[in-house]
Amino acid sequence: MKLLEKEAENIGCKVIHNADLKKYNTFRIGGKAAMLIELASLEACEKLIPLAEKENISYYIFGKGSNLIVDDNGINGVIFHISSDEIKLLDETRVYCAAGVPLSKLCMFALENGLSGLEFAYGIPGSVGGAVYMNAGAYGGEVKDVIESAEAIDTNGNSKRYSVDELEMSYRKSVFSGGKNVIVSAVFKLVKGERSEIKAKMDELMQKRRSKQPLEYPSAGSTFKRPEGSYASLLIEQCGLKGYSVGDAQVSEKHSGFVVNKGNASFDDLMKLICDVKKVIYDKTGYRLECEPEIISDREEYRR
């Protein structure tokens, strides 16, 4: 790990030892990582990820941490934190965006330039890289509707640009899901619109979020993927699990599709609650719920 640290410092990357991972995910749960390295450039990704592979160092990729559940036991390896923030117009309707840019910043950039198409994403608390990775969506819109291409590097440091068809996007999935390729940028194809209309739509959807979602508590957004033929929140309510708690982890009383941290929820609290909900739903309805956030843990049962 010393070699990786030295190389990171040589190319100007910030290195943090014993990084508190609570600060790097929206659930505010998790222990410490042996090392966290800020990847603020394509060069950093191209050099450090292959080196970690070569040195057989375990690592995880973090963006804004809005779709992660992190183990309190911490991580013995390295967290690569994508912090690149470049965003620019390529032409009148196409926007280039680095993977570390917050979705909210991309949405505001589109608004400032009179570009429509990303209104649905305003308020989603993730990064562009994370949004592409899982084909993030809300209120009838998805990343696949507005993305033109994405660039990623593989474990050898080779870069490839993927067309929208090559991204193989479907409900909360892309060609990158479950793999090790690291998204470094994306290009979005938007349409010209009236700024006042774009802002009105963004404000309308933000008001919906605030009225329906438990934004006052830490969470990872929707905790379960939508099962075919139904909705996770509906099944949870029908089975009487709204408000169900394990420690400070709770099925939100405001929106049953969200699990929230009421204060000092532990990783084990959260995982037990999720397992309990999945079991009750299956026993009572036959539906198998799938957890939407990714589990970040060195424990064998959670390793992917």
Question: Where do the model's predicted regions map?
Answer:
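Anion-binding (especially nucleotide phosphate/pyrophosphate-binding) glycine-rich loop
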Residues: K2-V128
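Phosphate/pyrophosphate- and phosphate-bearing ligand-binding catalytic cores of soluble enzymes
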Residues: I16-H17, I153-C275, K279-V280, K284-R304
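Conserved beta-strand segments that form the floor/walls of ligand-binding pockets within enzyme
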Residues: R28, Y96-A98, E119, G123, ...
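Structural signature of FAD isoalloxazine-binding scaffolds in flavoprotein oxidoreductases
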Residues: G30, I37-L42, I69-I87, Y133-V164, ...
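Short, basic and Ser/Thr-rich N-terminal targeting/leader segments
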Residues: E55, F62-K64, V146, Y217-P218, ...
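Short acidic (Asp/Glu) patches
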Residues: S104, M134-A136, E166-Y171
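A gly/ser-rich beta-alpha-beta helix-loop segment of oxidoreductase catalytic cores
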Residues: A110-E148, S219
